[in-house]
Amino acid sequence: MNSCNPLRIALDLDDTIFDFWGAYKALFPRESDLVEHIITRNVASLRYNKEFWENLSLLEKPNFEPHIYATKRINSKVYTRNCLAKHNLPIRPIYQMYYQHGNKADLIKGKCDVLIDDSISNVQMAINSGLPALLIDRPHNQNGNPLFRICSLDIDEIRFAYELELETLGWN
């Protein structure tokens, strides 16, 4: 990859660049609120909560401009753009998949070269669909298969891991 042909990166939002999990646990601290179907219900109750979505703290700022954002959020894109602007992050197209168990690759394949996500299942589904994907290392995904893992949102690390993934999978 060179600067004449930049890597088109699809970047997940929650727990990739924003601290969704920390904000969620502050609002829903009970152990019973940490079960998947309860999380889905609680997130649905936050759909119109502008303050929640616009005030998520920044986990990590990428040192590149993503081509697109890919998320499974159900809130207004306006809230997302406002949060991006608040943290001086680039405003780029936002692709939202409303079904939590859906495959982001169905939405973004052909619109990017690689997906970066914190979810092992999102990364695995993308790869199984023929879309290169990298797992950003976060505390909640330490027990899973390493897949193609990166430790930071650094463009050089991403390029290296992307090229290694293509070579490993025979996609180059």
Positions of the model-derived regions?
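Active-site neighborhood of HAD-like aspartate-dependent phosphohydrolases
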Residues: M1-K50
